[in-house]
Amino acid sequence: MNEFLNEAKAGAKAWLVKAGTSLAVILLVVIGARVYSSSKSAESVIDNPTEEAITFKLDGKDYTLEPKTSQVIKLSKGEHTLEYLGETTKFTKKAPKFLDTDYSIINPTKSLYVLYNEIYGENLTETEADEKSSTYDCEDDQGKPDKCPRKFLSDVFIQESVDYGLDEATPDNVDVAKSTRYTIKKKLFRGDDFSKYMGADSEDVILEPVEVK
């Protein structure tokens, strides 16, 4: 009997050690992801998509950006001040949400950007794809309230949760769980890049999934 109890205790101890190790691994993964997310969220992209060089001040520091260029800087959360062409604008960078794919742009020229819901799905009709990806408020051709897969942005400071930033290409394929049949990835475009991406006659893009699980 004692031998049986000892074996049971040893087995329980081994299980606890294994469970503890698994929990520790999970915690390390979560913490690592959080640190990576916070590190990326601390960065902001100053972007100049125009044909002219621009000069401005951010929090009292002078910057010059050549045409069609950008610069990545560290920008802390809180209030900041931008001075451009005699106009002073104050904006606030929010703290990122837990494990959020936070992305921010400083847009001195107030140029147009587009946040687009790219849908990847299996056996989806164009109507289904449009309904599932249209999560942003917009207006239809008659000016009535509607839902669209894109959101237009032109603020001095843009902060959004995205999967792909300005210079990151969307993949041709992504993994899609069988239980959902589709997934949506958010991509942020410069206005001109979005027009080229969509094409003159296209309204939406439906991409094929890979390794449907």
Predicted regions and their residues:
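Short loop/turn and low-complexity linker motifs enriched in small/turn-promoting residues
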Residues: 2-22, 28-67, 74, 85, ...
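Extracellular Ig-like/FN3 beta-sandwich strand-entry sites
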Residues: 77-79
